[in-house]
């Protein structure tokens, strides 16, 4: 389990589709981000540890974890 890679901010933006905070997406409501943010973050961290190594494995796995978290 030593294959865990720390993703840079740029890599995470590529996986999630860009820097949404600076694109004017409305986070001002606070409800969706504050209620699910911590739970979602822990799910992503836990999910990333189980993704197979290799660039395609990381992209597919990280996208899947993030996508399932956003539902």
UniProtKB/Swiss-Prot annotation:
One of its GO terms (cellular component) is extracellular region. It is found in: Secreted. The keyword Ubl conjugation does not apply. Its main location: secreted. It comes from the Bacteria. Disulfide bonds join 40-69. Keywords: Antibiotic, Antimicrobial, Bacteriocin, Disulfide bond, Plasmid, Secreted. GO terms for biological process: defense response to bacterium; killing of cells of another organism. The keyword Disulfide bond applies. Residues 1-18 form a propeptide. This is Bacteriocin carnobacteriocin-A. It comes from Carnobacterium maltaromaticum (Carnobacterium piscicola). The gene is cbnBA.
């Amino acid at each position: 389990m030593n294959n865990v890679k720390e993703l840079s901010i740029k890599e995470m933006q590529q996986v999630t589709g860009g820097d949404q905070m600076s694109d004017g997406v409305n986070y001002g409501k606070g409800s969706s981000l504050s209620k699910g943010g911590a739970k979602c973050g822990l799910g992503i961290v836990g999910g990333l540890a189980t993704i197979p190594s290799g660039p395609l494995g990381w992209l597919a796995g990280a996208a899947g974890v993030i996508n399932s978290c956003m539902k």
